[in-house]
Amino acid sequence: MAKKALISVSKKEGIVEFAKKLNELGYEIISTGGTYNLLKENRVNVVKVSDITGFPEIMDGRVKTLHPKIHGGLLAIRDNEEHIKALKEHGIEPIDIVVINLYPFKETILKENVTLEEAIENIDIGGPSMIRAAAKNYKYVTILVDPKDYDTVIEEIKQYGNTKEETRFYLAAKAFGHTALYDSLIYNYLIQKNNIEFPEVMAFAYEKAQDMRYGENPHQKAAFYKNPIKAYGIAECEQLHGKELSFNNINDANAAIELLREFKEPAAVAVKHTNPCGVAIADNIYNAYLKAYESDPVSIFGGIVALNRTVDVKTAEELIKIFLEIVIAPDFEEEAFEILKKKKNLRILRLKEGYEKEYDLKKVEGGLLVQEKDEIDLDENNLKVVTKKAPTQKEMEDLRFAWKVVKHVKSNAIVLAKDGATVGIGVGQVNRIWPTEQAIKQAGSKAKGSVLASDAFFPFPDVVEVASKAGITAIIQPGGSQNDALSIEAADKGGVSMIFTGIRHFKH
């Protein structure tokens, strides 16, 4: 009895050559629909599934392979006498290889203006059923869902007469991953259509983009996975030059891109260890970068710079003056790119347009915290001037700028800003006075005349008192402390204007 291979694929890459090789190795090919037609046109010896089942494809192809003569052939345990007896009684022949990839559901829902009906029609039923059946019976059946594995299977059959059990076991695991991803895409699409924000089940599936040399530290193994649907941000950056991105590179670049997205005007963001160390806006990208660099010329060394305008020659010439890990921008002038390429190891990334809201996920031991991303804009109508003195127009511009930045700094966070640039950033302290002192120390003489943004309220008036002594003229903070009155009193005493936003921006 000839061995049998069932082939039904939506992605036709390499399938004709693979089927011909199976023919040469003595396999009878069974197929359906478009795959059958393709194989027949290319002179592959192939029979229709309906010729095996004795039952035609019906309901516009919705029912093709859901038949005992198919699933019996896949699920039979070959050394079980009762199973073999059942096969003979019902005229079922074993199927040894299954090659399937599924209806293009992902490609369908990514189309513009796709209807729910179109999406539903591209939910594969028979395919996942055969994949699961073949994978479950991996001891006897080889399941293929990825063209990359075709050559391995052919070579093993040539060498051993069959695939090795360890190979079939690996391919079975891969197959269940394939159906898990597929089901996850369907589930999340339907949840979205039902407008359910936090469903009873969270089912995320990601596809591996690359293995990494190591993780956050050299002793940690790591890999990078991409969302198969949402194509934007660091996951979709095009690397134009430089060494392969590391785990920390990707993490830091992501932080830089998230902060950069806050600004519509020309902006430059420098990041180290996911915290901004220099941020600035200006009338052009060259001036924005110079201001960001001058914010902290020490910490930017070895950091990541993200820009939201095309990099010109002047900016490129400044960028190569120091060691940077990565430069990110929407594009690069040809000559500017050639200048940057002189730095052999500099990673140059082109940031693609586009953004979609998604969950913010935080892994904890044994669970997952899921929340909306902190993307609330500053509501000008809810701003409350709580001091006798109101901020000037210039101070308000800097306060808005500092408020955008402080949202992206690890708590407890303080940002000092002046003339559209950060001059001091206090990062990740366990009280509020320490990051204030850190930011003032970093700013030095630039603290005088600057404004201060705090990610959370002041439990005591000490921050205001220290800020006033340093010459800081205006403060923006959420408010809401039991001791707000003391902070307001200290601000009035020091001649500092203060605004309450009613919004907190903790970041952990």
From Swiss-Prot:
CDD domains: IMPCH. Keywords: Hydrolase, Multifunctional enzyme, Purine biosynthesis, Transferase. Its EC number is 2.1.2.3, 3.5.4.10. Residues 1-145 form the MGS-like domain. Pathway: Purine metabolism; IMP biosynthesis via de novo pathway; 5-formamido-1-(5-phospho-D-ribosyl)imidazole-4-carboxamide from 5-amino-1-(5-phospho-D-ribosyl)imidazole-4-carboxamide (10-formyl THF route): step 1/1; Purine metabolism; IMP biosynthesis via de novo pathway; IMP from 5-formamido-1-(5-phospho-D-ribosyl)imidazole-4-carboxamide: step 1/1. One of its GO terms (cellular component) is cytosol. InterPro entries: AICAR_Tfase_dup_dom_sf, Cytidine_deaminase-like, MGS-like_dom, MGS-like_dom_sf, PurH-like. PROSITE patterns: MGS (PS51855). GO terms for biological process: 'de novo' IMP biosynthetic process. NCBIfam families: PRK00881.1, purH. GO terms for molecular function: IMP cyclohydrolase activity; phosphoribosylaminoimidazolecarboxamide formyltransferase activity. It catalyses: (6R)-10-formyltetrahydrofolate + 5-amino-1-(5-phospho-beta-D-ribosyl)imidazole-4-carboxamide = 5-formamido-1-(5-phospho-D-ribosyl)imidazole-4-carboxamide + (6S)-5,6,7,8-tetrahydrofolate; IMP + H2O = 5-formamido-1-(5-phospho-D-ribosyl)imidazole-4-carboxamide. HAMAP family: PurH. Belongs to the PurH family. It comes from Thermoanaerobacter pseudethanolicus (strain ATCC 33223 / 39E) (Clostridium thermohydrosulfuricum). The IMP cyclohydrolase activity resides in the N-terminal region. The lineage of its organism: Bacteria, Bacillati, Bacillota, Clostridia, Thermoanaerobacterales. This is Bifunctional purine biosynthesis protein PurH.
